[in-house]
Amino acid sequence: MANIKSAKKRIKVIETKTLRNKVIKSKVKTLVKKVEVAVAASDKDLATKSLKDAVVAIDKAASKGVYHKKNAARKVGRLAKAVNSIA
């Protein structure tokens, strides 16, 4: 445990941010799974709707600093590619 007051404060802040990041990442993972399930079922309509929700969540996470900008772009690109592969 830290002895310095500022270090103790940083520990509290880090715990708060870690919790927030976990919640956001969990939500993104859930939305990504919805897209992947729809793609696996070849359901174009559901996949497209799910993709929109997932993209919004991923972009918000990137703007909050949960994901790096390029990591978010890569996730969105891969999901879009999967949805577009449905004939």
Curated annotation (Swiss-Prot):
InterPro entries: Ribosomal_bS20 (IPR002583), Ribosomal_bS20_sf (IPR036510). GO terms for biological process: translation. The keyword RNA-binding applies. The keyword RNA-binding applies. Binds directly to 16S ribosomal RNA. Belongs to the bacterial ribosomal protein bS20 family. This is Small ribosomal subunit protein bS20. It comes from Lachnoclostridium phytofermentans (strain ATCC 700394 / DSM 18823 / ISDg). The gene is rpsT.
